[in-house]
Amino acid sequence: MKPLMLQGHQRAITQIKYNREGDLLFSAAKDSKPNVWWSLNGERLGTFNGHGGVIWCLDVDWQSINLITGGGDSSCRLWDLETGKNIATLKSNSSVRTCNFSYSAYQAAYTTDKAMGHPCEVFVIDTRTIDETVSGQAPILKWEITDSKVTSMIWGSLDETIITGHEAGDLIQWDLRTGKKIHSVKEHTHQITDMQLSRDGTMFVTASKDHTAKLFDTNSLELLKEYKTERPVNSAALSPILDHVVLGGGQDAMEVTTTSTRQGKFDARFFHLVFEEEFGRVKGHFGPINSLAFHPDGKSYASGGEDGYVRVHNFDQSYFDYTFDYNRE
């Protein structure tokens, strides 16, 4: 299982994402230039130049036509994927922490940090036609977050809701017709660092600094499963073909210099989705894993770390042959 090492960033990776077909892999880092790679051979296709600071988030629409990025330069940008051109720039009052296209890509949402006297806010914009005029358009919907700030976000089913994960560990579901809260749960005790949907969108997995990842129902926010570790979890992803979930994390970045990689703190850890049991680990990064993504065909996965590398791992046949031992009575 020799990984591809993608080296195109000067600083720590913040988020990685595959497009729907899985032929492209996108990476965002703290060095202001998102990259796009061929996922098959690790060749870099290009960079998106324009941001003036750290990139916290990115997303690609289902047709792989446009890219959305958000960063510490208080802007959310829309890009033409083919040319790398910055089509529109949406200015905000503080850092853009999360951004996502809806499933249809008719809309996109992004959230800003509570900073510099400005509140944490959620914006929903119309992305049916993306051109220069988007920069001056008012959002379709915008609301203030009075609770702790949003640290992760996904779209709910049928593009009717948005689910936000917060610094205090809350999960809140919002109605997109009104911008009102539908309901909320608090199953985590610390910040929710990542949220990723299952392939069919019925479930999602959260990663948290409280040393757990948890599986929730998308519609009811009911807690289904819990995966426990001994250290903060920065990212978690669900396999599209098997009942597996992969977790990545480690200590906080500022403590990393004091530990050896031999301690296994920076491994990607595989758990069984149903039985909540860990069954495998993959070593590699020289620091915490900040972002994980399964390839849409489920035959490989990628990890982005604090060391600035993206590693693409293709699974061996033994991974697919492995079955969990349990009584079938």
UniProtKB/Swiss-Prot annotation:
Subcellular location: Cytoplasm
InterPro entries linked to this entry: eIF3i, WD40/YVTN_repeat-like_dom_sf, WD40_repeat_CS, WD40_repeat_dom_sf, WD40_rpt
GO molecular function annotations of the record: RNA binding; translation initiation factor activity
Gene Ontology biological process terms, A to Z: formation of cytoplasmic translation initiation complex
Keyword rRNA processing (UniProt): no
GO cellular component, as recorded: eukaryotic 43S preinitiation complex; eukaryotic 48S preinitiation complex; eukaryotic translation initiation factor 3 complex, eIF3m
Coiled coil feature spans: none
Main location group: cytoplasm
Domain of life: Eukaryota
Keywords: Cytoplasm, Initiation factor, Protein biosynthesis, Repeat, WD repeat
A Pfam family recorded for this sequence: EIF3I
PROSITE patterns hit by this protein: WD_REPEATS_1, WD_REPEATS_2, WD_REPEATS_REGION
Mapped WD repeat ranges: 8-47, 50-89, 145-184, 187-226, 284-323
Entry's family note: Belongs to the eIF-3 subunit I family.
Subunit comment: Component of the eukaryotic translation initiation factor 3 (eIF-3) complex.
Known function: Component of the eukaryotic translation initiation factor 3 (eIF-3) complex, which is involved in protein synthesis of a specialized repertoire of mRNAs and, together with other initiation factors, stimulates binding of mRNA and methionyl-tRNAi to the 40S ribosome. The eIF-3 complex specifically targets and initiates translation of a subset of mRNAs involved in cell proliferation.
Protein name: Eukaryotic translation initiation factor 3 subunit I
Lineage of the organism: Eukaryota, Metazoa, Ecdysozoa, Arthropoda, Hexapoda
